[in-house]
């Protein structure tokens, strides 16, 4: 999976001395807001909000990854989400769409539910063997999202 991007607009609020960032999705709608005393902190907060939102949507079987950009638009500042962020969201989405609980998925993989839950957390770094087993368990492609 290549990186995906969420461009954002930034505004400095003089009254509160904070940077306010508003993410814009691929349909140019607001997709997350964050504020902090520095752009870097606000960007990290926006990034965390976006990941939480994508995970929540995946829990409902909704694919919101398409709301992100495949390239950061020219002259834009963007939150960058990499494969280690996005692959767990894709795995969760596929599991939910197959109507499986984490426990049922773990059983198919021959691991504990706790070990499986780690695969669905952004930042996880599953090995190739694990990803192949996930693909087989879901009868769906996952590896194409890992590159």
Regions of interest found by a model, annotated:
Residues 129-147:
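DNA major-groove recognition helix of helix-turn-helix/homeodomain DNA-binding modules
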Residues 86-87, 111:
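Alpha-helix N-cap/N′ positions at the starts of helices
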Residues 89-108, 133:
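Short basic helix-loop element that most often maps to the first helix and adjoining turn
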Residues 110-125:
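Recognition helix of helix-turn-helix/homeodomain-like DNA-binding domains
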Residues 44, 93, 107, 118, ...:
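DNA-binding alpha-helical recognition surfaces that contact promoter or target DNA
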Residues 2-86:
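N-terminal flexible/basic segments that precede or flank functional cores
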């Amino acid at each position: 999976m290549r990186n995906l991007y969420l461009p954002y607009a930034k505004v400095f609020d003089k009254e509160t001395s904070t940077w306010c960032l508003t993410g814009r999705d691929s349909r140019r709608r607001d997709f997350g807001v964050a504020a902090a005393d520095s752009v870097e902190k606000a960007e990290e907060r926006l990034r965390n909000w976006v990941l939480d939102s994508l995970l929540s949507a995946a829990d409902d079987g909704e694919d919101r990854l398409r709301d992100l950009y495949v390239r950061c638009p020219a002259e834009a500042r963007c939150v960058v989400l990499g494969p280690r962020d996005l692959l767990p969201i894709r795995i969760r989405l596929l599991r939910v769409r197959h109507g499986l609980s984490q426990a049922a998925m773990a059983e198919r993989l021959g691991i504990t539910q706790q070990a499986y839950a780690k695969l669905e957390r952004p930042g996880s770094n599953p090995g190739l063997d694990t990803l192949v087993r996930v693909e087989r368990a879901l009868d769906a492609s996952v590896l194409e999202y890992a590159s």
